[in-house]
Each structure stands twice: as C-alpha cells, then as structure tokens.
Design a protein with these regions (language model features):
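Structured segments of extracytoplasmic/periplasmic soluble domains
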Residues: 4, 8, 17, 73-74, ...
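Short secondary-structure boundary segments
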Residues: 55, 83, 146, 206-207
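Extracytoplasmic ligand-binding site segments that recognize negatively charged/polar headgroups
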Residues: 1-138
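Conserved C-terminal helix/tail region of periplasmic/extracytoplasmic solute-binding proteins
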Residues: 235-302
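Mature extracytoplasmic/periplasmic domains
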Residues: 178-239
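Periplasmic-binding protein-like
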Residues: 108-117, 155-179
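A ligand-binding cleft/hinge motif common to bilobed small-molecule-binding domains
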Residues: 1-4, 141-158
Length: 302
C-alpha cells in the first residue's frame, strides 16, 4: 500500500532531522522494497502471515506444515480462507513456487485455478471473522496474521500458529504523512515520539505485534523475544519472506478479474442444483394437480 501511495503522490517525504529516533529501527527493516530509501515511511510494527490451526485435531508436526494443507480434503468444511485477492493469491503463488509479487499472466491463472479447486472444501471466505471462528472452534485451520494469532491463542490453548516452511509474506505497518498535511513538522515529531524506546515498548506490549525498534525489542521479556510466532528465525525471515510491492495496473486487473470469476463460480455451482430441484418440484406439483383432478372427477361421477 505504501508503494502505491508513493507512486500516486499521496504521501510526502520525511525530514529525518525531526525523527532522530529512527536510529532505533533495525537495519533489516530499513530500505525495504516498498520504500527503498525510507524517504516516505518509518516502520511501526511487523509480522508474518502463517497458519493457525487446532493442534488437538490436526496431528502434523509444525515443521512439516506448509500452505498445501489448506487444500487437504481431510479438513473439508473446516478450512477458512482470506477473503481478499492479494492475500489469497499470495498463498496459492507461494504454494506453486511463484513470487507473491508475480505479474506473469500464466502464473496468475495457475494460482486462480488452485484457488478454484480449493473452493469446494472451504467453509468460508472471511477476514476479521477468522478471530471469532477459530477462537470458538468453528473451524480447524486458517491463514492468519501472527500478532492476531497470539491474541486468539491466549483465549484458546488448543490453537497453534506456524509460518509455513516454503515461505510467506512479511508485512510491515509503517507511519507516513499524507501529502495534504499542513502540520508536517508536528507529524514528524509524533512519529519520533512513537519511536521513543519506552513508548514503542509499551505499544508493542499491548498490541502483541512485533517491533522493528531495537531498543523496544531489548525491553521485551525473554519468552517474548524467543517466541517463534512473534520473532521467527532471522535467517528464515531473510531467505523465505517477501514484502508486497504494488503490482502493475494490468496485473491488478487480471488478479481481480480472476478472483471475481473464482468467487462467482461458487454461485454457478449452486445454480447447477437449483434447476434440477426446480424441475423435480414442478413435476411433483403437476402430478399432484393431476391426482386431485382425478379424485375430483371420481367424486363428480358418484
């Protein structure tokens, strides 16, 4: 999104003289693809997309879990799936060994075909509802965001979260200043305040997302810093995660079109049942009418 806002001139460049606390931002969260020189944004939180699942019902070692589990028919009607094309396509793309930023038309078509094949076993396409459904045990498995997964796991101890071994999306929430802002210096001072170690620590401790702030990270309890949900192995992060960048208009249009076709195919499948049921109902109705007429004619005779 930041990359898109930069291209559309929706955000303005930052004056780092007003943001000295940027020095606390870890090197591996600087100069990411969406803002290569950090001219427009300061990282705020980060996390990974992974899989949350009921480990009492899914007896697979965490290190063996990969994205293809979301296509496993053993979990028919117990799988939740993201209800937005970018996240859903990313899962199918990684499953196929593609980049989650691919613009290759054939690769997008292949990802869409996989999503269409998966649809039959998916209980629901949802976003925020994943929290309630997984927390209540209404589903067994779903893709989800690490920070939110930690919150659900506090409420339901049968749940576990794993980052699939083949890789995933690394998301970074960042602070920017809109082009329309008339108080740029004040906004920069606020960003600096949010990067103050004590403030950044208190914020992260409350919202449970991961911090890119080295001083705030050092203040975290040892069990938090070593939790693989919040802070996966850094070698894995470097080798197996990718941030989203803005796709071309053509790729976005193709993805959206394929997504719409995939979702509407669900209705088409439903319609294949409607017509036969309607015809059967008509036949039954006609038979009933004929039977009533026959009975009535007999009564009239006698």
């Amino acid at each position: 999104m930041i990359n898109k806002m930069i291209k559309e001139k929706m955000v303005q460049k930052l004056d780092y003289d007003n943001i000295p606390n940027f020095k606390y931002i870890m090197p591996n969260f600087r100069n990411l693809e969406y803002d290569p020189d950090n001219e427009y944004s300061v990282p705020y939180t980060w996390g990974t997309v992974g899989i949350i699942y009921d480990e009492t019902m899914i007896d697979i070692p965490p290190e063996e879990i990969d994205w293809d589990i979301l296509w496993n028919e053993d979990y028919l009607d117990n799988i939740l799936m993201f209800d937005n094309p970018r996240d859903a396509f990313a899962i199918a793309e990684i499953k196929n060994g593609f980049s989650l930023n691919t613009e290759d038309s054939d690769e997008l078509i292949k990802a869409a075909e996989d999503l269409k094949a998966q649809k039959r076993i998916v209980q629901a396409y949802v976003m925020d509802e994943i929290f309630d459904k997984m927390g209540a045990g209404d589903a067994l498995i779903a893709p989800y965001y690490a920070g939110d997964a930690l919150t659900i796991m506090d409420e339901n101890d049968s749940l576990n979260f794993v980052v699939p071994k083949s890789g995933t999306n690394l998301f970074v929430d960042a602070m920017c200043i809109p082009t329309s802002s008339k108080q740029k210096e004040a906004a920069e001072m606020y960003i600096n305040f949010m990067c103050e170690p004590d403030i950044a620590y208190a914020n992260i401790d409350y919202i449970c997302y991961s911090t890119p702030n080295s001083a705030a990270y050092d203040k975290l309890d040892e069990d938090v810093r070593t939790n693989p949900v919040s802070y996966p192995d850094q070698d894995f992060i470097g080798e197996k995660t990718t941030v989203f960048v803005n796709l071309s208009d053509e790729a976005n249009l193709q993805m959206q079109t394929l997504w719409t076709e995939m979702k509407s195919a669900e209705d088409e499948n439903a319609n294949t049942w409607i017509m036969p049921v309607f015809l059967i109902a008509c036949i039954v109705f006609m038979i009933a009418v004929q039977v009533r007429r026959y009975i009535k004619s007999k009564k009239d005779i006698f």
